[in-house]
Regions:
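Catalytic helix-loop patch of NAD(P)-dependent Rossmann-fold dehydrogenases
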Residues: 131-181
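NAD(P)H-binding glycine-rich loop region in Rossmannoid oxidoreductase-like domains
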Residues: 54-105, 109, 113
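Mid/C-terminal beta-alpha module of Rossmann-like enzyme folds, strongest
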Residues: 220-280, 322-330, 353-356
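Alpha-helical substrate-binding/gating segment
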Residues: 191-199, 206-241
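NAD(P)-dependent short-chain dehydrogenase/reductase
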Residues: 166-210
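Amphipathic terminal alpha-helices
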Residues: 307-358
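Conserved Rossmann-fold NAD(P)-dependent oxidoreductase catalytic core, especially the SDR/UDP-sugar
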Residues: 105-150
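N-terminal Rossmann NAD(P)H-binding glycine-rich loop of SDR-like oxidoreductase domains
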Residues: 14-39
Length: 358
């Protein structure tokens, strides 16, 4: 990154930062940090949902899919695109198409008004979860999301579009790849899907995991804005949670280990029936490591306030089961696992009978 691109190295330039998705969990925190902690930056909050008005904040209620964005972005020096139409727990091709169409509209408008910096959120899942992944993955690793997980594939497509836009243009492009994000008392959508996929009937494998608090992600976005970072950066706390430590945090779980192909089949059935939001493509991410290094984002002056373990703890509201003594929880977990195994066997028999009838 060229240090001359830093905001503090250009005191004569008036910074106007547009934040899309400003009503969301990440966007609202980014807006709040920019308004409260960074004098000399005008912040324009863009969302089709309501955004709380506050001094120093210009709020625009806009539908990114249809409204004129050139007028909304006029005068902006940075566009931080945090709005999204897709979630990791839903496979919707039309939403994927809309996501890419909105990205294209945002980039076209940014080019039209002469924006000099664009920042977007991707995901560490674009590296894919593969048996040969190094631990940890750096930004130099290939982008190869698992082919049957549409959400990660779409994030990789967003990255390509943004990088192509920045190629040959006098503008900095920041792409941030966070790991699974959590908030206070709540797992994020991705973290919840991963957790659900690892209990019950789960694939073999116990990879290390990472959890990123949403406040730390917002701080990383602000660091990219402040430095006008030009490049790709992973966002995760230092290190990761090894399997044995995660087991201690979670306590006994009802879990039946099966081959990956069987776990995928079960996930497909659970998703189609509405029992659980587990896309089959998430299964490899519960079997193989995809933890990432954070050296590059730390070089911008960013540091996580929450460790992986702390992020997990603050996001986790103990259930009545988890408040029972450890021995009793273990007994219940074993009983539940046995019930799951019996259920799987019965289900397999019923499926075979149906196939024979057909």
């Amino acid at each position: 990154m060229d240090s001359r691109s830093r905001l503090e190295d250009n005191p004569n330039e008036h910074a106007v930062v547009v934040v899309t998705g400003a009503a969301g969990a990440v966007g609202s925190r980014v807006v709040r940090r920019l308004v409260h902690d960074h004098e000399g930056i005008d912040v324009r909050a863009v969302d089709k949902a309501n955004v709380d008005a506050r001094p120093g904040l210009d709020v625009k209620r806009v539908d990114l899919a249809s409204d004129d964005l050139t007028s909304v972005f006029a005068g902006a020096t940075s566009v931080v695109h945090l709005a999204t139409a897709v979630t990791p727990d839903v496979n919707d091709p039309s939403a994927d198409e809309l996501e890419l169409a909105i990205v294209s509209r945002v980039l076209d408008a940014a080019a039209e008004v002469g924006v000099s910096h664009v920042c977007v959120l991707s995901t560490a899942m674009v590296y894919g979860a593969w048996v040969d992944n190094p631990v940890p993955l750096t930004e130099d690793a290939d982008v190869r999301p698992n082919p049957d997980f549409p959400w990660a594939i779409t994030r990789a497509a967003v990255e390509r579009a943004v990088l192509e836009w920045g190629s040959g243009r006098e503008a900095a492009v920041s792409i941030l790849r966070p790991t699974a994000v959590v908030t206070a008392d709540t797992l994020g959508r991705l973290a919840q899907v991963l957790h659900t996929a690892r209990v019950g009937i789960a694939a073999d494998g116990d990879p290390p995991v990472q959890y990123l608090h949403v406040d730390d992600l917002a701080a990383a976005v602000v660091a990219a804005i402040q430095t006008r970072f030009d490049g790709v950066a992973n966002v995760a706390p230092d290190s990761w949670i090894p399997p044995d430590a995660l087991a201690d945090l979670e306590g006994p779980q009802a879990r039946v280990r099966v081959p990956a192909w069987a776990a995928r089949a079960v996930a497909a059935v659970r998703q189609r029936s509405g029992l659980a939001p587990i896309p089959p493509g998430i299964v490899p991410y519960t079997s193989h490591s995809w933890v990432v290094a954070n050296d590059r984002i730390r070089a911008l002056g960013w540091e996580a306030d929450y460790s992986n373990e702390e992020a997990w703890v603050v996001s986790h509201d103990p259930s009545p089961l988890e408040q029972l003594p450890a021995r009793r929880r273990q007994e219940l977990a074993l009983g539940a696992a046995a019930a799951l195994a019996i259920g799987c066997a019965v289900g397999a028999v019923l499926v075979l009978r149906r196939l024979r009838r057909n």
